[in-house]
């Protein structure tokens, strides 16, 4: 989602609260609970869940491994739920031609650097750059090249929905709005 006027361009970023993250966090949580229940059932010698007959599974080594996978899955699931709760990666990009300032804001993990706020003058922007990697896992990333700072990504590296035409159009619109050149690598 973005908002544009003659002098200001604001682009809101979704972050980690995506449908896919909710799906995988739920699947991982339920699957790891199943593994943990089977491991606990094999330790106790009776079925905790009637759907999962685990009396044939010996506690050592299968039950131990199932319990380990269950605990590991719960930790990974907790990590996913925390990133969703904290909305890591969300924020906005604001380009203000009137003031000549570009502001990039992102939410991170809790701590000292939870809020990532970058501010640049427009005259320090050298170009808008598109990095294209084709192949089995294609990537198209939009960067803003800043004098003395290097390249700053404007799109997430896991956004695979961009077709070459979409990323090129977005880069061209942004380069036109900022009145700077566009490069493709």
From Swiss-Prot:
It is a multi-pass membrane protein. The chain crosses the membrane at residues 21-43, 63-85. One of its GO terms (cellular component) is plastid. It comes from the Eukaryota. The keyword Nucleus does not apply. Pfam families: Ycf4. It is found in: Plastid, Chloroplast thylakoid membrane. Keywords: Chloroplast, Membrane, Photosynthesis, Plastid, Thylakoid, Transmembrane, Transmembrane helix. InterPro entries: PSI_Ycf4_assembly. GO terms for biological process: photosynthesis. Seems to be required for the assembly of the photosystem I complex. Belongs to the Ycf4 family. PANTHER family: PHOTOSYSTEM I ASSEMBLY PROTEIN YCF4, PTHR33288. This is Photosystem I assembly protein Ycf4. It comes from Oryza sativa subsp. indica (Rice). The lineage of its organism: Eukaryota, Viridiplantae, Streptophyta, Embryophyta, Tracheophyta. The gene is ycf4.
